[in-house]
A protein has these predicted regions:
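Short amphipathic alpha-helical interaction elements and helix-loop-helix interfaces
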Residues: 10, 16, 39-42, 54, ...
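Membrane-interface catalytic loops of GT-C/OST-like multi-pass glycosylation enzymes that act
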Residues: 22, 26, 35-50, 63, ...
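C-terminal, well-structured subdomains that either form a transmembrane helix-short loop-helix hairpin
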Residues: 3, 30-56, 99, 181-189
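Membrane-interfacial loop-to-transmembrane alpha-helix junctions, especially the N-terminal start
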Residues: 15-25, 66-67
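Hydrophobic, aromatic-rich transmembrane alpha-helices
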Residues: 1-19, 32
Length: 260
């Protein structure tokens, strides 16, 4: 849009009439305006407007401006290609492929494991291979993408009470009714709010039940979570420092801190 406005400078009535008599430009501008008025729309919904807008762009006529145009075009596409093609949600597939080995290395005797995928897209489950129902190691992917942090921790705490090793050595649920499970969290490093300087190796949280300890197993560094940016609350600098500075997708095993 900025490029189109620049090409229309100076904004005379004749130029504006000529621009908006273009049906492709009018369709793209109208669609962008309508979608922009509706809250919680994602940028990808505007993708159909891009081909329409590109057909309305006239390349600069002078050699210098034409050179600037192509330089900026190459830089823009290289930067967006790196961001969206490598880093945007880029740790999901490597993490999903590595999970069976991570779980078996951490707890070789476990037969059931639930992995909570939090603040990230749910991964393709077929990448787990033969770890579905009935396998020696059954891995279930739990979609927790939109959960608040407190709700996620409470949910896992309840699940640990039901399926984890009891703190007291005894449980209200008879052993023959208990399915022993391990619980894991796969989440962007930037998603955690811990109230102290962030260290993926030292994460613990207090819930209404015994405190939770998170044992860090792995980090997949080529991952940026663009869906957890809050410029209104944190400001531009703090948001970018958190999302870009703490880039990466981590995997943690969740356990309880039982009182002595």
């Amino acid at each position: 849009m900025v490029l189109l406005l620049t090409l229309g400078y100076p904004m005379t009535t004749a130029k504006l009439k000529a621009m908006f008599s273009n049906s492709r430009l009018t369709a793209a501008a109208t669609g962008t305006l309508i979608l922009s008025l509706i809250p919680h729309q994602e940028p990808r919904f505007l993708l159909p407007c891009i081909p329409l807008l590109l057909t309305c762009v006239r390349l600069p006529s002078t050699a210098d401006w034409r050179r600037y145009f192509w330089i900026s075009w190459i830089i823009f596409n290289a930067a967006l290609g790196l961001l969206m093609g490598v880093y945007h949600q880029g740790g999901i597939i490597p993490a999903q492929l590595a999970l069976p080995a991570l779980i078996q290395h951490t707890h070789p005797s476990v037969s059931h494991a639930d992995v909570f995928w939090w603040k990230t897209y749910p991964p393709p489950t077929y990448l787990l291979g033969d770890h579905g129902p009935g396998a020696d190691l059954e891995i279930a992917s739990v979609n927790s993408m939109g959960m608040p942090q407190s709700e996620l921790l409470q949910t896992i705490s309840l699940a640990l009470e039901k399926h984890g090793a009891p703190c007291s050595g005894a449980s209200l649920i008879p052993s023959f009714l208990r399915t022993q499970k391990d619980f894991y969290i796969a989440a962007p490093l930037s998603a955690w709010r811990s109230g102290k300087p962030f260290d993926p190796q030292d994460l613990s949280f207090v819930t209404d039940r015994p405190a939770l300890n998170l044992t860090h197993l792995a980090t997949f560094p080529k991952h940026i979570n663009l869906d957890d940016m809050d410029f209104g609350e944190e400001g531009v600098y703090n948001t970018l420092a958190r999302v870009v500075g703490r880039r990466g997708l981590g995997v943690w095993r969740v356990g309880r801190s039982c009182p002595p």
